[in-house]
Amino acid sequence: MDFEIENESEIPQLVDVEEVNTQPHSETLSVPTVSSNNDIDSFEQQSDFLLVDHDSTLDPVPVTILTGFLGAGKTSLLRSILENRNGKRVAVLMNEVGDSGDLERSLMEDVGGEELYEEWVALSNGCMCCTVKDNGIKALEKIMRQKGRFDNIVIETTGIANPGPLAQTFWLDDALKSDVKLDGIVTVIDCKNIDNILKDESDIGFIQISHADCLILNKTDLISSEALSVVRQTILKINCLAKIIETTYGRLDDISEILDLDAYGNENTSNLEWSIQRSNDSNINCSTCLDVDCQHLHSLDTHSLDISTHTFKLPPLMSKEVFQQFLQWVRHTLWSCLEEGEDEEFMIYRSKGIFNKDDGSWYIFQGVREVFEIMPLSEKPRAFLEKDIHPEIILIGRNLHRISPFVVGNQ
């Protein structure tokens, strides 16, 4: 559900259901976040409110955003998805700069000339992930008019696109969210040329990697096993949250590895639990280390990365008061870069976390840039049962070393 925010520093207020249904959609930044003026009990009520499904006879169709730098192999991966969909009805939305649509569409035909996709909506000028969202939303609405035909929607973005604004669209547009849900962002990486990609002045390679829920390391056949290890180390320093899959020629036999990730829900937390466990067990913040003689792999100059992963430990068994302090820290951290006149000291692209409160209940934190949600979990995550793992929030972004950690009593 959307909350209209005029001042980013203000706490979002609950909106009456009837009021939401009758008011026209506003272009004002809407931040769906759980918050409370009083205590954590109000937060629980609001969480339930946020999780109420819209009146629909059909479940939301999962949308996969497929991104990656130019030439990484997105089209090859898309063809692999369509060839191995095992009866799944997949709608495809292309979003490439230039007039390559007919060419790429022809690549989606099997040897008999039969089209491998259910629906094709082409957008010109790479508008989907750039500054204009309207055309992309209209294209999705066109697909959703035939919603019953599809099991999945795949959006292939332009190679120079930032997937962040598109991902936010599924949270910001309430009417759209009732028909589709963001399932995951899949970024394809050209392992052979990743060094040049990360040196690009636009930083788009970093940004695409940082937003990913699943990273496809493509063209692994063109590099040595040692070089592949360097690539994996570099990727983990930028984004420790994403699932990593290695491919050649974009071939993927089991498409369930990248479709139906449920990366933004509260039902499947296994990958986040694994990420938190990995961050507890390994040095994922190596991009900030200063020891030039350290034993980590640095062939891709990871010491100079200003986009990286950083973890912040959270106190276990949060009380009502501590939870309110945590919310205040989250708002300040995620929203401070929105304030006019402020220098961009840091930028957060993706955030995830798991924490608990003192009554034994557990929660998952999800965020893309300044938009975040907190949702209750039905049970204690398995990883926390099997090991002594500390609750934490993981941030992916730029210059994260400038962020003050959450300290109880300092908010």
Swiss-Prot record:
This is Zinc-regulated GTPase metalloprotein activator 1. Signal peptide: none annotated. It is an enzyme of class 3 (hydrolase). GTP binds at residues 68-75, 130-134, 218-221. Zinc chaperone that directly transfers zinc cofactor to target metalloproteins, thereby activating them. Catalyzes zinc insertion into the active site of methionine aminopeptidase map1, which function to cleave the initiator methionine from polypeptides during or after protein translation. Mechanistically, the N-terminal psi-PxLVp motif binds to the C6H2-type zinc finger of inactive form of map1. GO terms for cellular component: cytoplasm. Keywords: Chaperone, GTP-binding, Hydrolase, Metal-binding, Nucleotide-binding, Zinc. GO terms for biological process: intracellular zinc ion homeostasis. It comes from the Eukaryota. A motif (psi-PxLVp motif) lies at residues 9-16. GO terms for molecular function: GTP binding; GTPase activity; zinc ion binding. Its EC number is 3.6.5.-. A motif (CXCC motif) lies at residues 127-130. Belongs to the SIMIBI class G3E GTPase family. ZNG1 subfamily. Residues 307-411 form the CobW C-terminal domain. It comes from Schizosaccharomyces pombe (strain 972 / ATCC 24843) (Fission yeast).
